A protein has these predicted regions:
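A glycine/serine/threonine-rich, flexible loop-to-helix segment
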Residues: 200-216
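A short, mixed-charge helix-start or loop-turn motif at secondary-structure junctions
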Residues: 11, 158, 162, 214-218, ...
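Short acidic-hydrophobic sequence patches enriched in Asp/Glu that either
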Residues: 41, 209-210, 220, 266
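C-terminal helical subdomain
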Residues: 71, 169, 193, 215-256, ...
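Short, flexible, mixed-charge acidic loops at enzyme active sites
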Residues: 149-154, 206-210, 248-249
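Short glycine/threonine-rich loop-to-helix capping motif typified by GTGT followed
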Residues: 205, 260-261
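Hydrophobic alpha-helix feature that most strongly marks membrane-spanning transmembrane helices
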Residues: 185, 208, 237-240
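Rossmann-fold NAD(P)H-dependent dehydrogenase/reductase core
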Residues: 1-202, 277-281
Length: 281
């Protein structure tokens, strides 16, 4: 299928499934706009995209998505340079062994895995509307099935563990996707989320503690980044899912999210709480 003339914004596009998704979409003719933290990896990835897929003017913007000001600034930068965005892939994510808070007072996992996609999507909303029909795809995880929403402790000040923080952030991701789709109904912008499965990537390498070792073992049995990116690429490009929205996918199959994640009251309350924390009306 062709993505000629389409612009795709991708976070976490310099490694792993994000990079594989960027390459696959570029091969279809899409123009890739990356959001990256590391300038060295960003420039290397951009150079490779331009060399392998010269038909489009690929670009990269730099931001530390742990910082609220950076989230808002990079969204504004992209909105200022892109008249339309056909696909937004919120793919960047991490797990951290120890609880640390950002300059804004957010626990890091919550900031990167939930607040950043929320802020970036909000900041790019007019460009997505301008491209309608457009798509938002959020990378989530099956571990959300093990989480309960704790609106009274979004900053995870009580009983922090890396596992708890991660699964809670993935629950937030599913809830955000569902509420986004509800609020944007009629805008011709779909919103879906996907668990790509276990993939052999760099995920967890810099998390600290025993997390790198744990993921190293898991990655021995994981699929390749290219294969892991397939469900994301499908949601971004396939006409088969063009009309689907507010859905959760396990790999390439439509699946049921947890009852906690399908609770509309949870989704609405989380949206309002996140908007308040992020200073978004």
């Amino acid at each position: 299928m062709s993505m000629e003339g389409k612009t795709c914004v991708i976070t976490g596009a310099t490694s792993g499934i994000g990079r594989a998704a960027a390459e696959a979409l570029a091969a279809m003719g899409a123009r890739i706009v990356m959001v990256a933290r590391d300038k060295k990896r960003g420039e290397a990835t951009l150079a490779e995209l331009r060399a392998r897929f010269p038909g489009a003017d690929h670009s990269v913007h730099y931001a530390d998505l742990l910082q609220l000001a950076n989230m808002k600034r990079v969204a504004a930068d992209i909105a200022a340079t892109e008249p339309r965005i056909d696909v937004l892939l919120n793919n960047a994510g991490a797990m951290f062994a120890w609880r640390k808070v950002t300059a804004d007072g957010f626990e890091r996992t919550f900031a990167l895995n939930h607040v950043a996609p929320f802020v970036l999507t909000h900041g790019l909303r007019e460009r997505l509307f301008a491209a309608a029909p457009a798509r938002v795809v959020n990378t989530t995880g099956a571990l959300h099935h093990l989480a309960k929403l704790h609106l009274d402790d979004l900053k995870l000040e009580r009983n922090y563990t890396a596992f708890y923080a991660y699964k809670h952030s993935k629950l937030c991701s599913v809830l955000f996707t569902r509420e986004l789709a509800r609020r944007w109904a009629g805008k011709q912008v779909t919103a879906n989320c996907v668990h790509p499965g276990e993939v052999a990537t760099r995920f967890g390498e810099q998390a600290g503690g025993l997390i790198p070792l744990t993921f190293a073992v898991i990655h021995l049995f994981g699929s390749s980044p290219k294969r892991g990116a397939n469900p994301i690429v499908r949601l971004a490009s396939s006409p088969d899912v063009a009309a689907m929205t507010r859905c959760y996918f396990y790999k390439e199959k439509l699946a049921r999210a947890s009852p906690e994640a399908e609770n509309d009251d949870n989704a609405s309350r989380l949206w309002k709480a996140t908007a308040l924390l992020a200073g978004i009306e």
